[in-house]
Amino acid sequence: MSTAIRYLRLYLHRPAAQGGGRRGIGYLSQYGDILRVSFDEDYIADPQRPTLSLSYRGANEADTQQILRSARDARLVRTDGRWPAYFQNLLPEGHNRDRLARERGCAPDDEFELLAAAGHDLMGALEVEPVPAQEGVPDVVRYWHTTQGLDVLEPGFVEYPVEDAASLPGVVTKFSAVQDGRRYLVKRRGAAGSVILKLPTTAHPDLVANEFTCYQLAGSLGLHCAQARIITRAEAELPEAVPFDDILAVQRFDHLADGTRVHMEEFNQALGYAPRQKYGKGLLQDWATMLRVVDRLSDQPVQDTREFLARMVAFILMGNTDAHLKNWALVYPDGHTPRLAPLYDPVCVAAFFEGATEHQYAVNRAIDRSMRALGWDALQALIKTAGLLRIPRHLALLRDLVRRAQADWPALLADAPSTLQRTVQARLAGGVALTHP
């Protein structure tokens, strides 16, 4: 094996209230197929350390420090050429991954290079970049490899992040952009994007209209949503030609227009799952687990648990069968304490079942069967499993939400794609168990 080791400095941006700027918290390294995160000792020893992920927290401070110092914990090191799960979830998928690999000149499965390529525009307040060559191999990195019997002799070369490259998780084609007047620019001159531009697909040219309508449906119920609007192709300066007229522009809640970064993580990261495990352990169990996290750890638990339950019911009513663990998130406004992130990526996937073969959307169809069958007794049991109190009050609020959706959504669906109209109207008219007394 080559004795060259490559490494990146790992930073978290501080909240503006704490003076802003960024704090180094550790290093990411690659030695052959070994990919590891090594945290700085001052970060480990700081009881007020900024939160990278709930997956790195233990039951108490001593447990947390033990995790952060661990030599072999899978949350810190892997030997198969992949990042530990938290960092895997930062990487794009599908076309977005292929595009980033082309920009970097690396293979799509080279996870070290992909993360390094997009190091200045990652999800949340995280940033990574190469260490200046003259600094040599960081002691904390060299020490771990030496204790494992690995002969680390020389630093390998790592290029700086690709200008304007971004890592946006998900499979739908999207670009990171900034808004300049009425224009949306992907060529950002190195600035992190504050807007995500999402494109439709040839299979679903109405995807943008579908998602925008679902944002409107959710917003009409008072749910806390990311801000989204439909723009024309002429309003966006994209790096490549696209055959679509409409683009969905979504304001990021982790990267603000003034350059502020707010840390966030997907629930998939918080629970320690790899991207391929985004459907978790099943709809009801995952919802109960997320509810429990929000109730016990949020700095606004009453507001967030009510919001979470309302989103669950809204997703059932609108047929959003792709609300997996990567489409729910936590934000850390103070850099430490989580709260439920705004709603994002609401899509009526059930509308795509029409005209598809029975083998297409198999996972989503199975989820849809569970959603449509979920009645009030099962919902009550889920809330109880999550450990929430005042269950009758929660159920009363959710019953009222169903009535409001039945009253208000038909007007909002008037200009929606026809398949979306038919799908949601059928659900409101008795197609899901929650519309029954």
Question: Where do the model's predicted regions map?
Answer:
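Phosphate/dinucleotide-binding and metal-coordinating scaffold of catalytic cores
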Residues: 1-325, 329-437
